[in-house]
Structure formats: C-alpha cells, structure tokens
C-alpha cells in the first residue's frame, strides 16, 4: 500500500531557452568584417560608422578595426562604431 497520497498536477514547470543576448566584442577589441558585436532585442545600441544592423537588430562590423562605444546626440543614444586601423 502507498504511504503517500497522490500529488496533484501543476501547470508550472516550463521555461524558455536563454537567447544569449548582449555585447560580444567590447570597446578596444580588434574585429574582422562580419564579426558580431552586439546581439540585442530592439535598438539598445545603434549602428555607428562601419557597423551594420541585421533584421533582428544584431550589430556587426562591416570593416576591420577596433570597436568603439560612444554616447552622443540629444537623446544620449549609445552608438557602436569601428575605427579602421
């Protein structure tokens, strides 16, 4: 005979897979053209010079060089640029 009563069911117990978002190459790091710099949802960071934006807002290098993060404009937006070496 069972010494424990049957447990009830639950509607919890699920979680989504982590999306691995965030900065992949930091300021001052050397990158090659095509390297992913930031994976993001929306435009937390905006594309500066020598940086392209994918349709999922991923920022990537369009030229070889060093990564530079800067805040500029009236709205204090964060821009990511590549400074060619």
UniProtKB/Swiss-Prot annotation:
Pfam families assigned to the protein according to its UniProt record, in alphabetical order: Ribosomal_L27 (PF01016)
Region (Disordered): 1-20
Keywords: Ribonucleoprotein, Ribosomal protein
Gene Ontology biological process terms, A to Z: translation
Ribonucleoprotein as UniProt keyword: yes
GO CC annotation, single: cytosolic large ribosomal subunit
UniProt-listed InterPro entries: Ribosomal_bL27 (IPR001684), Ribosomal_bL27_CS (IPR018261)
Keyword Hydrolase: no
GO molecular function: structural constituent of ribosome
Family to which this protein belongs: Belongs to the bacterial ribosomal protein bL27 family.
PANTHER family membership: LARGE RIBOSOMAL SUBUNIT PROTEIN BL27M (PTHR15893:SF0), RIBOSOMAL PROTEIN L27 (PTHR15893)
NCBIfam families: L27
Protein known as: Large ribosomal subunit protein bL27
Organism of this sequence: Pasteurella multocida (strain Pm70)
